[in-house]
Every structure is written in structure tokens, then in C-alpha cells.
Amino acid sequence: MIAVIQRVTSASVTIDQKIKSKIGRGLLVLIGIQPDDDKNDIDWLSRKIVNLRIFNDEENVMNKSLKDVDGELLVVSQFTLHASTKKGNRPSYIAAAKPEIAILLYEEFVTVISSDLEKQALTGEFGADMKVELLNDGPVTIIIDSKNKK
């Protein structure tokens, strides 16, 4: 499971020209799911994201987590995070989980991270054509792969 985590002052998801979800200060998390991802990946990644100290404290040092700042969370599924560009110029998405597997893991991830955060994560719509808008704060963008826990 790959997560692209972006600290934002605001973010939103629009589907069919209607805003589905909108947050203020917090994190926008793009999630890519692989076929071999499981509950262990979900639990580890959720805890990591919720407790990542990437918000500034009173001394302007990144020392506070999403929980510490009572921030909001927007989670969007993005299978293209598993693109392979090794051959040719057209990306291959063979490493991404099939939709029937990915949707279950995505929904479980949203449930777990909402519980860990102790507030409901907002979402996009799995498989939909979405317009994602964000105002990156910093900018702070971090990529985490649950298969590479170094």
C-alpha cells in the first residue's frame, strides 16, 4: 500500500461538477493498493499517517501530528500510484489491485484511519473520475510504502 501524504490548508474532491468532500487544515492522502496488501498494511499505514509529526509547533518546528492539531483528513484512492514506467512510454498498472479487491481494502483503510484519528475521514468516490484540488502547505509531501518499513 502506497500513500502520498500532503499537508494542506484546504483540499476538496469534485465529481460531476459537485463537491463531494472538502477539508480545511489537515492531510490529503492518496492511496494506492496492491493485490497483496492486507490488514497489517492497513493498520501500520493508518497509525503512521495519524501520528506523523509534520505540523508545526509553537516554535515553528514540525513536531505535531494530525491528531495533535485536530486536523481534518481527506482520503482518495489512486491506482496510478502503482504505475510501472520501465518499458515504453505508456504506464502499466499491473501492480495495482483489481477494483473488486481494492475497494474492500480502501473502505477498510478509511474505517481504520477514522478510528485511529477519532474523527471521520472524508473521501473521494472509489473508481470515479474525480477532480482533486489542494493547497499544499509548506509544501510538505511524504510518500510511504507499507512494504518498505525502513
Cite the ranges covered by each PLM segment.
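N-terminal, polar/charged subdomain of small-to-medium soluble alpha/beta proteins
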Residues: 1-88, 97, 103-150
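Glycine-rich, phosphate-binding/catalytic loops in enzymes
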Residues: 93
